[in-house]
Design a protein with these regions (language model features):
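Active-site-proximal beta-strand/loop segments in catalytic clefts of secreted hydrolases
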Residues: 76-79, 102-106, 129-130, 167-171, ...
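Catalytic grooves of carbohydrate-active enzymes
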Residues: 217-245
Length: 245
């Protein structure tokens, strides 16, 4: 499944939050699916954990971008601030690159100036919910509340509308959750490159991170990076140089 170009020309999330039609969501499976990919060292598009016969695209959910071009879509999950965000933003600005930052409500509340900086510097800021729950374990009303309250907090504290992209917490989804998200006007963005980077107390080496990209990069890659990762922060300039080579 190919993501449309990740531009900020999407419906602002504050408008997207209104459901457009009444849907019987009970028709959609609520079985929990943990997102994962089988990365390929031959640089071909990885396979993802999608139920047989299901098209993610039908739900406006994507895990790769344009697979015909040598492009990569940088995405960062922002659960809380670890002291590396400004340096990451500085690197992106220096390289004239844009990313998507998926923010939780607590991240916005604790770092409104950082979120404003992301928007001012041309990045997309997407939704990562209020309390970071597995959405397959939430009823429809709870999913809506998790998403809408996060978007409202961003508008209130930064003055900016949230861009209508979402990353499901922990990468756990269900077809029902994807349908609710789609009906709210959001695109679900998963990932095609990932590794263990989210524990600040157990960080990989910079060489390990760079080697992951060197080994598994593919056209249209959407890597999952974490804002609390010292390794990601320090590896980012090397990753960018690698992609330009």
């Amino acid at each position: 499944d190919v993501v449309p170009t990740l531009e900020a020309t999407v419906l602002p999330a504050t408008q997207a939050g209104k459901m457009t039609k009444k849907t019987n969501y009970k028709k959609y499976s609520n079985t929990s699916i943990g997102w994962g990919v089988s990365m390929h060292a031959d640089h071909t598009t990885p396979g993802g954990n999608v139920p047989k016969g299901v098209s993610l695209k039908k739900y406006q959910a994507y895990y790769v971008g344009n697979t015909k071009e040598k492009v990569m879509y940088l995405t960062f999950d922002c659960g809380y601030e670890g002291g590396y965000t400004r340096k990451i933003l500085k690197t992106l600005k220096k390289e004239n690159l844009k990313a998507i930052f998926f923010v939780t409500k607590p991240f916005i509340e604790e770092n409104p100036k950082l979120v404003k900086k992301m928007k001012k510097e041309g990045h997309l800021v997407g939704n990562h919910t209020c309390t970071h729950p597995q959405l397959s374990k939430c009823n429809v009303a709870k999913i809506r509340k998790e998403i809408n309250d996060c978007a409202k907090t961003m508008k209130k504290l930064t003055g900016y509308n949230m861009d209508a992209f979402i990353r499901p917490p922990e990468g756990v989804y269900s077809l029902r959750a994807l349908k609710v998200i789609k009906d709210m006007g959001y695109k679900t963005i998963l990932w095609s490159i990932a590794y263990y980077d989210y524990d600040p107390q157990n960080q990989p080496s910079v060489d390990y991170v760079v080697n992951k990209f060197k080994t598994y990069y593919h056209k249209g890659a959407i890597p999952l990076l974490h804002i609390v990762s010292k390794a990601d922060c320090e590896a980012l300039p090397k990753i960018i140089r690698l992609m330009h080579s």
